């Protein structure tokens, strides 16, 4: 049962058997421990690509959707990409509070890329965030929510998606995932789908557009130039991040 709605035991689309958990291997929070049956890997906390996915909703009404800001790190282990969820902010916010929350998240986590689902009012917010030097990539879904969630299931079923074991919000997140698509809200599902099933996928015609953000204090750890894609649809060909002297690029995989 999630928010008064019955849910299938173990999940309808996203299964509880697929959930994996990462932990800090030391008190200094410098090494991440990944442990599952047949899999053991230790990862330096700064070893991966940090990015964010955001699902915007600008309303304080009790019936409104939530704004969700998720922070992820993508690493490569055993010749496969793994996605580690670091943080998830989920609350109802109006416009000014929403902008401030995104700025705070960027300042704290210093993501290379911030994916924002953009349509309607979100387009204006994306432009405001870009003007503040935030490395926004607009994401325009070309499929329904269920299809996008299904695109994320292979990585989850393969044990390549990891949640923080000790996060206070973890149980609410899992309840929403297991309740999908019957749950009253699916904002966290949308962000997860974007991160795993769409955010690192680009059309074959993708061309990076360089944006200089070197003067932004929130991005002191970023490259001098960060190449930010034009708006793109979920789908396309799998891509990887390549770093060069000129910035960060997403390239198609063979």
Please report, for each region that a protein language model flagged, where it lies by residue.
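An active-site-proximal beta-strand-loop segment
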Residues: 54-67
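Acidic two-metal-ion nuclease catalytic site recognized across multiple nuclease folds
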Residues: 11-14, 196-254
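Short, function-defining helix-loop hinge/capping sites that tune catalysis or transport
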Residues: 49, 63, 69, 125, ...
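ATPase catalytic-site recognition across NTP-hydrolyzing enzymes
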Residues: 1-56
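Short glycine/threonine-rich catalytic loop with a Thr-x-Gly-x-Asp
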Residues: 184-185
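Mg2+-dependent endonuclease catalytic cores in nucleic-acid-processing enzymes, primarily RNase H-like
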Residues: 5-9, 13, 17, 68-70, ...
């Amino acid at each position: 049962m999630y928010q008064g709605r019955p849910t299938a035991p173990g999940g309808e689309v996203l299964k509880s058997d697929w959930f994996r958990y990462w932990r800090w291997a030391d008190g200094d929070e410098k090494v991440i421990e990944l442990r599952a049956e047949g899999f053991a890997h230790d990862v330096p906390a700064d070893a991966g690509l940090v990015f964010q996915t955001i699902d915007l909703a600008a309303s304080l009404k009790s019936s409104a959707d939530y704004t969700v800001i998720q922070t992820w790190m993508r690493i490569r282990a055993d010749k496969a990409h793994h996605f580690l969820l670091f943080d998830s902010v989920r609350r109802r916010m109006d416009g000014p509070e929403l902008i401030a929350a995104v700025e705070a998240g960027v300042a704290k986590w210093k993501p290379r890329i911030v994916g924002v689902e953009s349509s309607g009012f979100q387009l204006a917010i994306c432009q405001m965030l870009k003007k503040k030097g935030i490395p926004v990539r607009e994401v325009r879904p070309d499929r329904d929510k269920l299809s996008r969630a299904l695109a994320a299931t292979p990585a989850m079923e393969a044990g390549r998606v990891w949640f923080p074991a000790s996060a206070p919000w973890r149980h609410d997140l899992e309840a929403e995932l297991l309740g999908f698509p019957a749950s009253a809200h699916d904002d966290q599902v949308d962000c997860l789908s974007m991160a795993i099933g769409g955010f690192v996928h680009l059309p074959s015609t993708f061309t990076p557009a360089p944006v200089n953000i070197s003067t932004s204090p929130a991005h002191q750890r970023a490259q001098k130039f960060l190449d930010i894609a034009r708006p793109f649809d979920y789908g396309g060909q799998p891509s990887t991040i390549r770093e060069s002297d000129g910035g960060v690029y997403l390239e198609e995989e063979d």
